[in-house]
Amino acid sequence: MEDYNNQMDHESSGGRGNFLYASPNLGGNYGRAASDHQMGINTFHLQSSGGGGGGGSGDQCNFQSPGTHPINVKTEATTSQHGHPKFQYNNNNNNHHLVSSSRGHQPVVHQLQHNLDLQNDDHSLSSNEVEAIKAKIIAHPQYSNLVEAYMDCQRVGAPSDVVPRLSVARQEFEARQRSSGTSRETSKDPELDQFMEAYYDMLVKYREELTRPIQEAMDFMRRIETQLNMLGNNNNAPPLRIFSPSEDKCEGIGSSEDEQENSGGETEVPEIDPRAEDRELKNHLLRKYSGYLSSLKQELSKKKKKGKLPKEARQKLLSWWELHYKWPYPSESEKVALAESTGLDQKQINNWFINQRKRHWKPSEDMQFMVMDGLHPQNAALYMDGHYTGDVHYRLGP
């Protein structure tokens, strides 16, 4: 498939797009001499003409191959005497018109073009040979699959009012196939078999290429829809739907009966944001414990932060610190005396001395030797009582 040109015609005409693709050598050369191996480019032009009402309507599908005249496939609202589909062929200037109808039903555009290059070197085939080739194609066992594959391509991205018509036309075609009772034996023409298989595979691949971008767009919009609904749940907003229930079916994407049977009825679950569950749990806990949290916050706010000690108490502690700088470890009796003079409790006094020693005191070398040698505590009492007479000057605290 070299290119795809999907341009919508005027809405009043109800036409579908044009699609351009390259056919395989075998498919494009059926009915031609085997010496020609060029790759044919086939152009499909599907148009609708005429209006509704009692007068009937007609639709035309034009197909053209390189070096040949366009081949027109057309359906009109005509009725045969026996109520069966009627096929008419006009062979003027190599233009072929296929007219099909059934009793009691309004016709819908469903045509399948088999690209037949009916030129053999410089000589055209006779009308009888053309009719024989077309009859072989219609009678081929693969013909019904080819029609269904073509209709599946038409369903991809079709408007909501066209999809039901396509479904009805497909059911009518299947009913006519069953009622005709035509025996479809195994084909004995290998070239025709390969021709039918090549075009069937081409239509299947064409449908997959059409479906992929539309399906990706639908998945993206579903994810956006899910995320918007999650954001709106906090405000108790009604759920948002980007697609209506009819559009949510992707307008025929992946709706072929074969795929539905193979899928086992499973539907694709839209992707969910992994953080949505955490947010939902957070909101639930806030709603349940918001009262406790607010009361706890108020209780904590009432507690004053611990401030500095009174200035007078700090001055008394610093005076004791300067007198006992060599060994600033007050005894229990001294702590009680300091507590009475400063008005502080022993815990505050202990904390003040711990912080003061960490910040402003370092044992002298003599004191370190005394601790290492394990001297008698009576010698250490000299430092505690202030009787140690040394030349080292005291360092005043802040």
From Swiss-Prot:
PROSITE patterns the UniProt entry points to: ELK (PS51213), HOMEOBOX_1 (PS00027), HOMEOBOX_2 (PS50071)
Predominant cellular place of this UniProt entry's protein: nucleus
Tissue: Expressed only in the stems.
Positions of region (Disordered): 43-69, 172-192, 234-277
GO terms, molecular function: DNA binding; DNA-binding transcription factor activity, RNA polymerase II-specific
Localization in the cell: Nucleus
Residue stretches making up the ELK domain: 280-300
Keywords for the protein's UniProt record, in alphabetical order: DNA-binding, Homeobox, Nucleus
Segments of skewed composition (Gly residues): 49-58
Pfam families in the cross-refs: ELK (PF03789), Homeobox_KN (PF05920), KNOX1 (PF03790), KNOX2 (PF03791)
DNA-binding region: 301-364
Any one cellular-component term (Gene Ontology): nucleus
Signal peptide: none
Protein purpose: Probably binds to the DNA sequence 5'-TGAC-3'.
Family listed: Belongs to the TALE/KNOX homeobox family.
Protein name in the entry: Homeobox protein knotted-1-like 1
Lineage, opening ranks: Eukaryota, Viridiplantae, Streptophyta, Embryophyta, Tracheophyta
